[in-house]
């Protein structure tokens, strides 16, 4: 009986106009109002792969013709991949954390994080008639930032891989926080969000924290770039007329 009494009491608090009928025979007009919060499920990340370079010149030498040594390749700094959020997500949620992976399905591919924010990448080389001709090695740097609001102030943290992907270093080899702003500003060259130019990065978070529901007003950036110089071509035998490498890129959200 107590439950019934409480229920009736709650109902009695509803506006009487909800249950009111109009006077018989009079003209009638009314309005039904519906409202609620809007939660966007649109993924805010956009990505751009670098243009590459098809004019890298390699000079022959006797040792190279015999397949006995590597050939230095003067690489310029080249964009590998840029990513940014174009919308501010009200709170972290599932499906917002990007797992960037390189080299999926490429036989002979390897990526090893050797220094803070720096990786050694090895790709298989194809030569004439798409025949496997050797390997190409270069250095790549990568970093990301997670931005969210806390007590009315923006917080910027460097992100490291905790999704078992290879597009970011682990926590122990993450880029130094003091190096992240300048590095990403150079990579984006004015195409990043406005806060990229003024941010101060403090501390680190796993990239999975983009899905942390306790975070508010979530945004982020990611950048990877080939480091100028340091490329090396290793051939299995005679020098082909042309050599090619490609770096597969894939992104899965978690």
Swiss-Prot record:
InterPro entries: Fimbrial_K88_FaeH (IPR003467). It comes from the Bacteria. One of its GO terms (cellular component) is pilus. Its main location: other. GO terms for biological process: cell adhesion. The keyword Signal applies. Keywords: Fimbrium, Plasmid, Signal. It is found in: Fimbrium. Residues 1-20 form the signal peptide. Belongs to the fimbrial K88 protein family. K88 minor fimbrial subunit, plays an essential role in the biogenesis of the K88 fimbriae. Fimbriae (also called pili), are polar filaments radiating from the surface of the bacterium to a length of 0.5-1.5 micrometers and numbering 100-300 per cell. They enable bacteria to colonize the epithelium of specific host organs. This is K88 minor fimbrial subunit FaeI. It comes from Escherichia coli.
């Amino acid at each position: 009986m107590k439950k019934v009494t409480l229920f009736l009491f709650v109902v009695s608090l509803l506006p009487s106009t909800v249950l009111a009928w109009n006077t018989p025979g009079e003209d009638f007009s009314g309005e039904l109002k519906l409202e609620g919060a809007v939660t966007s499920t649109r993924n805010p990340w956009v990505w751009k792969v670098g243009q590459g370079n098809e004019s890298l010149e390699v000079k022959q030498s006797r040792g190279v013709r015999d397949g006995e040594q590597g050939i230095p390749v003067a690489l310029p700094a080249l964009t590998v991949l840029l990513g940014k959020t174009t919308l501010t997500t009200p709170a972290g949620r599932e499906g917002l954390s990007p797992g960037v992976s390189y080299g999926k399905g490429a036989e002979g591919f390897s990526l090893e994080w050797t220094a803070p924010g720096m990786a050694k990448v090895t790709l298989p080389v194809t030569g004439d008639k798409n025949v496997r001709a050797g390997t190409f090695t270069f250095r790549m740097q990568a970093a990301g930032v997670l931005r969210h609001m806390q007590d009315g102030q923006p917080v910027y943290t460097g992100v490291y891989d905790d999704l078992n992907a290879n597009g970011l270093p682990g926590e122990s080899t993450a880029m130094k926080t003091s190096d992240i702003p300048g590095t990403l500003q150079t990579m984006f060259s004015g195409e990043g969000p406005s806060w990229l130019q003024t941010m101060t990065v403090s501390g680190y978070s796993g990239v999975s924290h983009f899905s942390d529901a306790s975070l508010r007003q979530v945004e982020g950036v990611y950048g990877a770039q080939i480091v100028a110089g340091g490329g090396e071509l290793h051939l299995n035998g005679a020098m082909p007329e042309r050599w090619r490498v490609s770096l597969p890129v894939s992104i899965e959200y978690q």
